[in-house]
Design a protein with these regions (language model features):
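Carbohydrate-interacting/catalytic domains
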Residues: 2-3, 8, 12-175
Length: 175
């Protein structure tokens, strides 16, 4: 969601990441070096594929005009360098993303939003709907986040305008 265009190498969906050699950024199983048959069905059955997540992210990207542009990217402060927070806004469509950059450990942080960048008043509170989980939270200028790799590595929030529906979970929530 950071960039409007992206792609992945075949096999990445199966989390293949063995380097070609020590310290190399190139992958051993890259189609650059070989053709490798992959067992997609077994990976799906065993839960060792991120293909459903990639599919969901692509669906979210198609649904939100804010994610179709590059120059509308704005970063928001986190008090933990292992988490990144950014937003994209196009007209009334506002998407806020928080990602755990640590693939091994759960990370927590307070996210401080630049409310005017979201088209909101500094002290406003709005419902944010997580497009990955379906949950809705009430967020204001500062918000607590806890993200676990393998379970909830990110939030992709659709920021609901003040006239939008109230949160489904009854108010502020810990993510």
């Amino acid at each position: 969601t950071l960039s409007p265009t992206w792609g992945i190498y075949s096999g990445y969906e199966l989390c293949e990441n063995t380097p070609l050699r020590e310290g190399s950024e190139e992958y051993l199983d890259s189609e650059k070096y070989q053709l490798k048959p992959r067992d997609w069905a077994t990976a799906a059955r065993e839960g060792t594929t991120i293909a459903p997540l990639v599919t969901r992210l692509n669906t979210i990207r198609r649904a939100h005009p804010a994610l179709h542009r590059l120059r509308n990217l704005r970063f928001h402060h986190t008090d933990n360098d292992a988490l990144i927070a950014y937003s994209k806004r196009e007209g009334s469509d506002v998407v806020l993303v928080v990602v755990n950059l640590d693939p091994h450990r759960t990370q927590e942080a307070t996210i401080s939003l630049d409310m005017p960048q979201l088209g909101l008043d500094r002290h406003e509170s709005v419902p944010v709907h997580d497009e990955l989980t379906g949950r809705t939270y009430q967020w204001g200028r500062t918000n607590y986040v806890r993200l676990e790799p393998g379970r909830a590595p990110a939030h992709v929030f659709h920021v609901r305008r003040p006239s939008a529906a109230a949160p489904q979970n009854g108010g502020a929530g810990v993510s």
